[in-house]
Amino acid sequence: GHAGQLPIDGCGRRDRSPFESSLPSASAEHENVAETSTPDGDDLLPDVPPEARPQHVAIIMDGNGRWAQRRNLPRIEGHRRGVKALRTTTELCVRLGVKYLTLYCFSSENWKRPQPELNALMNLLEQYMVEERGELVRENIRVSVLGRREQMPASALREMDKTVELCREHSRLHVCLAINYGGRAELVDAARNLASA
């Protein structure tokens, strides 16, 4: 297995980690964030010393469409549930004192999906940026966007840029959204850089 990977139902398959039994699942099936800690604020990981807790959690958001299809739901419903799981995951990271959360949201290979699904995904991204902005500011969460801006809809870029700018100085948790990233894209960029050198 891969050390330090937490399985998040609805966000793809991951190897089991030593933290699995200590953390509640953040999925469409386990959406109640209120159950993740006791009312008096007890530590979520009482048996794990602070120095042994992860400072950086990375999640590859994969499998949401398949999750929905297995339940006879539209693929976009799986993506919506994935966004909901992200809210839970972000809250857990804040409560656990995680400093960095990297979310691999949309790879460059995802452009091969059917256009209606792409439109829905871009709308979800834009909606997330607008709807979560206030909470990100209140919780002192910084947001960065990694990846290529090419092909991204102007309205989604505008909302991402607004959120990044509003949260630029925040420091409680740094959420890095990897959007339009991928190995092939990186190879193309590297080849272009070499050719122009």
Named regions from a protein language model:
Residues C11-R14, P18-A197:
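Flexible, compositionally biased loop and terminal segments
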